[in-house]
Design a protein with these regions (language model features):
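Append "and occasionally in soluble cytosolic enzymes with long acidic Gly/Pro-rich linkers
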Residues: 315-411
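Gly/Pro-rich hinge or "lid" segments in bacterial periplasmic/extracellular proteins
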Residues: 114, 198-247, 251, 261, ...
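Ligand-site clamp/hinge motif
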Residues: 211, 239-285, 423
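Ligand/substrate-recognition segments at binding pockets and active sites
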Residues: 379-450
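N-terminal lobe/hinge region of extracytoplasmic solute-binding protein
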Residues: 78-126, 218, 536-537
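Detector for C-terminal structural segments
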Residues: 326-355, 405-412, 435-548
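Surface-exposed binding/hinge segments that line
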Residues: 124, 128, 167-208
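Aromatic- and charge-enriched surface segment that lines or borders ligand/interaction sites
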Residues: 121-163
């Protein structure tokens, strides 16, 4: 068949249309595929962007430098008191060994001030003069040495050799060890051995161990001393193999502030994370600020005036009574501590079974004037100040910043004395020098009389004639006899009565003016947890301390 030109053109048109249809279908399919691919790419791109954003957020919450990472793992605590060393056998420095989490004792006081096992598992009394202590088997010192009976024996022997206060309290005749047990034999019956082994001077140390600083011992606590600089502060690092579990933070910095007013500014500027010793005048503002947390406990720490019996005026009973009568305990506690303190009747708080029920103290300015007049202290030359035997009466008052409220109390007393015609001059001293001072009338002093739940150690040290803590040289033969009786008394009711009798004698003699009991408070940034106050006032840093 012969094809015509029209046939050829018709087929060409059909083929062309078919080709265009195929091409169009391909393009449509291609475009659809591209749309799907674009959707996939958009989804992938969106996911990637979200991931990057999340990574960016996560990164901003993490320390951006080694310095910031270190800071996140460091808790800095400011204190207004810092000893020259933390050897537990040196004076009262064991308080800081325990407070900083460096050292631990065989027993530990709970919140009810009852001794509980700590480094010890249990204690038994085979006879009246013997105590057998079984030790934990999983404790190591911060140099890796295991805590054995022999190590504990050496530590306790070192203690009674170096500390007269501890030796007098414990009355140890001999110490023997066997494996994980230690047997203590006493010279006389010792009814409160568990309590005394919870006293911070009883911190167990490795006598043969060498710490990074000669100012600190090798203890068993969660933190070990790396740097210790008197009058500045200390650096503590977590002990990797602490028996209670490694600490949650890597480092603790202790920073000393000689000026209590500066410690508040340091907390606000984040120079420190927490403070102990904040002026009570500043405490109220922190309670209202959600950026901070406060751990506050009713404690047994009191503020007092200790009268120096070496001073000839103070040695006069009526003059000393006049000094006591001029102290307005109610106003002092309300104005100085801003509601965080209560007036005291004696050295033990009313919550204690041992507390004195009633004091002979009374605030009475007119009575003070009358006492001075009767004792021959009179203003004979009209200058506004009293004389005795023709000589103007001038006394010296010590002042120091152990508490920011102390200087304020002394200044108030100076003014009160002036109003009754006694010239008083204030001399500022370091708290560490107070015990060695001899030329003064009275000094403020802050004490916890029964940090181990029983007041015997306090009476034996601070009240008994010649006691190592009796800085005012108070002496009463009857009180001494009762303290000696208290040392061996096993009946709790009789211990309570003896303690009240001793306080009544102190009170009657006006040997001390116990002004009031104040709460112990730690103020911290809200990021800090597990930094708690305790009624004893010496358990602060633990392995649970954390920082968010």
């Amino acid at each position: 068949m012969i094809k015509t030109q029209n046939d050829i053109e018709s087929k060409t048109v059909v083929i062309g249309i078919g080709y265009l249809f195929v091409l169009f279908s391909f393009q449509v399919n291609y475009i659809n595929r591209m749309k799907i691919q674009m959707k996939k790419w958009k989804l992938l791109l969106g996911t990637a962007l979200v991931s990057v954003a999340l990574l960016g957020c996560a990164k901003t919450n993490q320390p951006s430098s080694p310095e910031e990472a270190k800071k996140a793992q460091t808790v800095t605590i400011g204190y207004t008191q810092f000893p020259t060393n933390i050897d537990p056998a040196d004076e009262y420095n064991g308080w800081f060994t325990v407070r900083y989490g460096v050292g631990e004792t065989l027993f530990k006081m709970d919140d009810q001030l009852e001794p509980q096992p700590w480094l010890a598992e249990k204690i038994e009394q085979p006879s009246q003069l013997e105590w057998k202590i079984t030790l934990r088997n999983d404790v190591t010192f911060q140099n890796g040495e295991k805590m054995t009976g022999a190590k504990v024996e050496a530590s306790l022997k070192r203690l009674i050799e170096k500390s007269k206060r501890a030796a007098d309290d414990l009355g140890i005749e001999s110490i023997h060890s066997d494996g994980q047990t230690v047997t203590i034999k006493t010279k006389i019956e010792q009814p409160i051995m568990k309590n005394l082994l919870a006293e911070p001077y009883s911190v167990i140390v490795d006598v043969d161990g060498k710490a990074a600083s000669d100012k600190a011992p090798v203890g068993t606590g969660p933190f070990l001393i790396k740097i210790y600089t008197p009058e500045t502060g200390a650096t503590l690092e977590a002990y990797e193999n602490y028996w209670g579990g490694k600490a949650k933070v890597a480092q603790v910095q202790i920073k000393y502030f000689s000026d209590p007013t500066a410690i508040s500014a340091a907390l606000q500027s984040k120079e420190v994370d927490a403070v102990y010793g904040l002026p009570y005048a500043n405490l109220a503002s922190y309670k209202k600020d959600s950026q901070y947390k406060i751990s506050e406990k009713e404690g047994g720490r009191y503020l007092s005036y200790v009268y120096n019996f070496e001073n000839p005026y103070v040695a006069d009973d009526q003059f000393r009574q006049a000094l006591d009568t001029l102290v307005d305990k109610k106003t002092f506690t309300e104005s100085l501590f801003k509601g965080a303190a209560v007036p005291a009747t004696g050295p033990l708080p009313s919550s204690s079974d041992f507390a004195l029920d009633k004091s002979v103290h009374e605030f009475n300015v007119e009575k003070a004037k009358k006492l001075l007049d009767e004792a021959g202290y009179k203003d004979t030359d009209g200058d506004g100040y009293r004389e005795k035997d023709g000589k103007k009466v001038t006394i010296e008052l010590l002042s120091f910043t152990r508490l920011p409220e102390m200087p304020l109390a002394v200044e108030a007393s100076q003014q009160q004395l002036k109003e009754v015609g006694i010239e008083a001059k204030i001399r500022k001293v370091e708290v560490s020098a107070v015990a060695k001072e001899i030329d003064y009338a009275f000094t403020p002093y802050a004490v916890v009389a029964a940090p181990i739940g029983d007041p015997y150690a306090y009476f034996n040290s601070a009240v008994k004639t010649g006691g190592v803590g009796n800085i005012g040289h108070y002496s009463n033969a009857e009180a001494d006899q009762k303290i000696e009786a208290l040392a061996t008394e096993t009946d709790q009711k009789k211990r309570i009565q003896l303690s009240k009798d001793i306080q009544a004698l102190m009170d009657k003699d006006h040997g001390y003016t116990i002004i009031g009991f104040y709460k112990v408070a730690i103020v911290m940034d809200k990021s800090i947890s597990h930094l708690e106050s305790h009624p004893t006032d010496y358990y602060h840093v633990t392995n649970k301390l954390s920082k968010e």
